Amino acid sequence: MSKVELNKETGPREVFCGLTSIVWLHRRMPDAFFLVVGSRTCAHLIQSAAGVMIFAEPRFGTAILEEKDLAGLADAHEELDRVVNDLISRRPEIKTLFLVGSCPSEVIKLDLATVSEKLNKRFLGQVRFVNYSGSGIETTFTQGEDGALKALVPLMESTDDEKLLLVGTLANNVEDRFKKIFNHIGITNVESFPPRQSTELPKIGKNTKVLLTQPYLSDTVRDLKHRGCEIIYAPFPLGVEGSSKWFLAGADAFKINELKVHEVIAPLANRARQALEKHTEILRGKKLFLLPESQLEISLARFLHNECGMELIEVGTPYLNKDLMDEELNLLPDDTKIVEGQHVEKQLDRVRATSPDLVVCGMGLANPLEAEGISTKWSIEMVFSPIHGIDQAADLAGLFSRPLKRNQILTSKTLATH
């Protein structure tokens, strides 16, 4: 274990809820539909988060719980049945329908598991129903994907075939690139979870080796282990360093010589480091403060310090799974301050006291900080953008160099007018 400084903090939080994950999950599985059982606030959140990204009829919606539902004066189950029947009659192409719980549905104890069971019997052979919680009562927004994948694990058939399973949503082009690299390394049976079609779930078993692409899938990992899968612990594939070690860990699990891995990835790494240079010129020596929201913070801190030369003031993370993050923690400087959890007022006080050059935070905090003259980067962009892999290292760095470059340009223009 690294000697980083680990701290815990509790108090008021400022994060999105797990419903936000629907935005990238519904892009990943175009044959699925996500039906949020929640309030009008839930509907507004999803529409706002996804509205700018939808270029066709969306594959998500909200079954609205009215005030009389929340007060127990109406049967929410009847209304949900009506919405589902109407939806399936209008959208016969739906193969999997996710019933997504929310804060309101959990408050009134709406049993979506029982609802899903009944609907599976009614629509047997036509539509598969799966339920999970996207509530933000005790979770952050990326855990919505964890809940969705965990709900799918029991539906995955068993196999003894040896395979590498990449777990966590990736952009399709990044997934294709990863599979191609692994094929060159010598691993030919590579599958992804979630798959591109919700009905084509990979089979798993004792010879399935799981390599995570995202750090926020603790519950999914636990269930995959219970199914007999072997978990490969590695840094996450962000940047040249993390991606290289990730490929090496995957190869080692299949007893492939690391010289073969280096032979395949060395040309990619050299090109990526050259592409990084224009960004490191801007980022090197700049002070970075990461507020907790996505659970990507530790991996991002490692990349931005080790490969881009940024100075880490504080690395916040909503939750810290030490088993999954140990390899990442070992790559951080020993004096790195990591804070698990959040007391948003205290953290904002520390931001103001340390005057960072860049703060990675949620959208709700970005505008107030910008108004105080502090450059920010939305953490949710890291989930919506294709940032994984050696080839994407420069694009990842660019997400952080651009706000600093913009600030430099604005500052120079302001000075020129005086």
UniProtKB/Swiss-Prot annotation:
UniProt xrefs under InterPro entries:
LIPOR_BchN/ChlN (IPR050293), Nase/OxRdtase_comp1 (IPR000510), Protochl_reductN (IPR005970)
Catalytic activity reads: chlorophyllide a + oxidized 2[4Fe-4S]-[ferredoxin] + 2 ADP + 2 phosphate = protochlorophyllide a + reduced 2[4Fe-4S]-[ferredoxin] + 2 ATP + 2 H2O
**Which cofactors are named for this entry?**
[4Fe-4S] cluster
| Top EC class, one word | oxidoreductase
Signal peptide annotation:
none
List, alphabetically, the Gene3D superfamilies matched: Nitrogenase molybdenum iron protein domain (3.40.50.1980)
| Sites where the protein binds [4Fe-4S] cluster | 17, 42, 103
List the pathway annotation. Answer: Porphyrin-containing compound metabolism; chlorophyll biosynthesis (light-independent)
- Keywords linked to the UniProt accession: 4Fe-4S, ATP-binding, Chlorophyll biosynthesis, Iron, Iron-sulfur, Metal-binding, Nucleotide-binding, Oxidoreductase, Photosynthesis
- EC number(s) given by UniProt: 1.3.7.7
Cofactor: binding comment: Binds 1 [4Fe-4S] cluster per heterodimer. The cluster is bound at the heterodimer interface by residues from both subunits.
- GO BP, sorted A to Z: light-independent chlorophyll biosynthetic process; photosynthesis, dark reaction
> GO MF annotations for this entry?
4 iron, 4 sulfur cluster binding; ATP binding; metal ion binding; oxidoreductase activity, acting on iron-sulfur proteins as donors; oxidoreductase activity, acting on the CH-CH group of donors, iron-sulfur protein as acceptor
Assembly with partners or alone: Protochlorophyllide reductase is composed of three subunits; ChlL, ChlN and ChlB. Forms a heterotetramer of two ChlB and two ChlN subunits.
**Its job:** Component of the dark-operative protochlorophyllide reductase (DPOR) that uses Mg-ATP and reduced ferredoxin to reduce ring D of protochlorophyllide (Pchlide) to form chlorophyllide a (Chlide). This reaction is light-independent. The NB-protein (ChlN-ChlB) is the catalytic component of the complex.
**Protein family according to the UniProt entry:** Belongs to the BchN/ChlN family.
Q: What is this protein called?
A: Light-independent protochlorophyllide reductase subunit N
Source species? Prochlorococcus marinus (strain MIT 9312)
